[in-house]
């Protein structure tokens, strides 16, 4: 269970203070589809970022499974994001030169999962979103809706407890939006899904709870949740492990990036070589000119020696 207690957040630019969230409190069930509605600047995305650990609150508390995050360090937030949260954004954020399967596997690669296990999990996640037969396509060979489904598969491959979606249908047409929303609704049967949207029709049709924000304050909540003593379980701290990528894995990904962009790599190398050679020639020419001038000065002075005579 996720509990947001009296969260406040301000953004400061010089003397200007923008209050994004003002004493926001919200209790979220383990399995529900929550839609956060509100106009631009109401604090929707800020709230989503705080839930996902992408932003820090100024005061209040975010309680995860009974554990306060007030004393969380950077490594705790990193582990929380990588193991508990799945992110789906309006922009798909897929790596264009990688296949669909490789894009989904990347989330597990960062978590240090072995190749065999991550391949199996990635295929299962893509099957779940209906893309099991398009594993080896690249993002530029897919439609917007398909790319968003790849992004959802990537978010689900780590089996997160919470899925956060920021305007997941913002760049899609109405028919494709319905497909994505159907998928998110299905996902919400097994975990908590929190979606930010400007579309009240989609929210009312698919979400089982709508929270409306305005000027950083919750105006309405269609299905509020107040945990009682029976609902509140003893605090449990989940050992989520450390997320890391080995040096060899990072080197392999970099090499694949260079290999798939051969023309750009060659042109960049050629341009860099010309630049280095040009600098070397300028330095050599400058050194040669200075040496020539010095030799000329010495020869001139030797031909016309200066004579100093004393008078008096």
Sequence positions of predicted segments:
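Alpha-helical transmembrane segments
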Residues: 264, 277-307
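Catalytic Walker B motif of ABC-type/P-loop ATPase nucleotide-binding domains
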Residues: 163-166
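Conserved ABC ATPase signature
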Residues: 79, 138-148
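Conserved ABC ATPase "signature" region
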Residues: 67-68, 105, 109, 116-133
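Conserved signature/switch motifs of ABC ATPase nucleotide-binding domains
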Residues: 82, 137-140, 157-158, 189
């Amino acid at each position: 269970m996720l509990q947001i207690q009296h969260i406040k957040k301000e953004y400061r630019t010089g003397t200007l203070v923008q209050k994004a969230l003002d004493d926001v409190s919200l209790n979220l069930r383990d399995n529900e589809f929550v839609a956060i509605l509100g106009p631009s600047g109401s604090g929707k995305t800020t709230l989503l970022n705080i839930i996902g650990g992408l932003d820090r609150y100024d005061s209040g508390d975010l309680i995860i499974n009974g554990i306060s995050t007030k004393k969380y360090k950077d490594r705790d937030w990193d582990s929380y994001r990588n193991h508990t949260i799945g992110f789906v954004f309006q922009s798909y954020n897929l790596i264009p030169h990688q296949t669909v399967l490789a894009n989904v596997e990347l989330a597990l690669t960062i978590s240090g999962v072995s190749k065999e296990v991550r391949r199996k999990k990635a295929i299962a996640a893509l099957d779940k979103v209906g893309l099991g037969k398009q594993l080896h396509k690249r993002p530029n060979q897919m439609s917007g809706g398909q790319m968003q489904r790849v992004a959802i598969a990537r978010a689900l491959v780590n089996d997160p407890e919470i899925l956060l979606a920021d305007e997941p249908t913002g760049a899609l047409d109405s028919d494709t939006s319905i497909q994505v929303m159907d998928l998110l609704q299905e996902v919400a049967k097994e975990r908590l899904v929190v979606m930010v949207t400007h579309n009240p029709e989609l929210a009312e049709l698919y979400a089982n709870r709508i929270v409306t924000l305005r000027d950083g304050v919750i105006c309405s909540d269609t299905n509020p949740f107040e945990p009682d003593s029976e609902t509140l379980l003893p605090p449990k701290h989940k050992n989520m492990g450390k997320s890391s990528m080995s040096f060899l894995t990072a080197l392999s990904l970099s090499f694949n990036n260079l290999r798939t962009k051969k023309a750009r790599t060659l042109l960049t190398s050629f341009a860099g070589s010309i630049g280095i050679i040009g600098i070397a020639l300028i330095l050599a020419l400058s050194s040669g000119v200075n040496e020539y001038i010095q030799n000329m000065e010495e020869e001139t002075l030797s031909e016309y020696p200066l004579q100093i005579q004393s008078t008096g």
